[in-house]
Amino acid sequence: MFNNTNKIIEIERNNNKNIEKELFYKYLNENEPIIFTKFSTDWEALSKWNDPNYLINIIGNDHIVDVNKCSFGGYYKDIIKIKFSEFISKSINNQFDNFDLNGNKIKKVNKPYLRNFEMFEDFPIFEQDINCDIIFDKDKHNLIVKRAFIGSVGSATSFHIDTGDNLVTVIKGCKFIVMISPNDSKFLDFQKSREIEISFNQNDNDGIPLEYHPAFSNCKYIYKTLLRKGESLFIPNNWTHYVHNISDHDDNFNEDNNNNNNCNNNNNLTISVSCWGKSIYDLVVG
């Protein structure tokens, strides 16, 4: 059996409240992930969005959203059109199917997940609840893109790379995140990572834990973290990463972690905001 224990690195945490642009770009230039534990603790979204009715009252009962599974097997073929209020209700009540028509358990990456939700463009009032773009230098990142990600219980994204420098902040629930550096991504066995589920703790019986997962046998390092409510993770461009949305019962992750915020989530819903810093020049030339 493979043993990856010595390869696993817990992503560093910065506990400063005020994150200056200079410090942020220091991490960016070093091309290393970092968690800012207090950057977003005063965001109104952390309290307002805890009540899903706040979101529904603004978005409306009949607003249709494109919920897509996260297998990245073709964005459009997996899209499910559903009322936003219905998606929230089914997520809260855990009403999405756990087994397919053949009785096989549905993989995490095939569970419904509302990602890249353009709620800030469609409903600008939500802008006042967050404040993520202040960390970006507009001379270096002259295009800031903000999207919401709302996950049903146990949903996940397969390993992928973003199209910009991403600051992802958890508003509700938790996320188990695995990251592989650009230098190591060629050694990641993507096929095995798709075929064999990744279990994030001893209570997650679906798959194999990182320590023994064959997809990482040739990787030099495996970065991991449990990103909690109010924490922000900087994901540098070109880092390959996997994200698993954690339910309210799955908060026993790491007894040695000193962060007092657990993953208690009283209605089986995980919400996060991604704020990408991009360069229009790079998008045009690249």
UniProtKB/Swiss-Prot annotation:
PANTHER family: HYPOXIA-INDUCIBLE FACTOR 1 ALPHA INHIBITOR-RELATED, JMJC DOMAIN-CONTAINING PROTEIN A-RELATED. SUPFAM superfamilies: Clavaminate synthase-like. Gene3D superfamilies: Cupin. The gene is jcdB. Residues 112-274 form the JmjC domain. InterPro entries: Cupin_8 (IPR041667), JmjC_dom (IPR003347). It comes from the Eukaryota. This is JmjC domain-containing protein B. One of its GO terms (molecular function) is 2-oxoglutarate-dependent dioxygenase activity. It comes from Dictyostelium discoideum (Social amoeba). It holds the Pfam family Cupin_8.
